[in-house]
Amino acid sequence: MAVEKVNSSSSLAEVIDRILDKGIVVDAWVRVSLVGIELLAIEARVVVASVETYLKYAEAVGLTATAAAPAV
């Protein structure tokens, strides 16, 4: 995947359209500990994409019901 560099400014609508078209994943992992005792652990994965984009990539990795169901 190539990175495109554009010198002109983009409107908010163009940025949102691009994010929904390509999708974005934010993966976070936080651990809070005090004196070696873990007090809090948070693990999160946030996916922002259009339904069409999500289904295209989810089916490719077997996350949809049609991809997981055995063929009869």
UniProtKB/Swiss-Prot annotation:
GO CC term, one of those recorded: gas vesicle shell
Protein name, entry field: Gas vesicle protein A
Record-level Gene Ontology MF annotations: structural molecule activity
Assigned protein family: Belongs to the gas vesicle GvpA family.
Subunit structure: The gas vesicle shell is 2 nm thick and consists of a single layer of this protein. It forms helical ribs nearly perpendicular to the long axis of the vesicle.
Function description: Gas vesicles are hollow, gas filled proteinaceous nanostructures found in some microorganisms. During planktonic growth they allow positioning of the organism at a favorable depth for light or nutrient acquisition. GvpA forms the protein shell.
PANTHER family (UniProt xref): GAS VESICLE PROTEIN A1, GAS VESICLE STRUCTURAL PROTEIN 2-RELATED
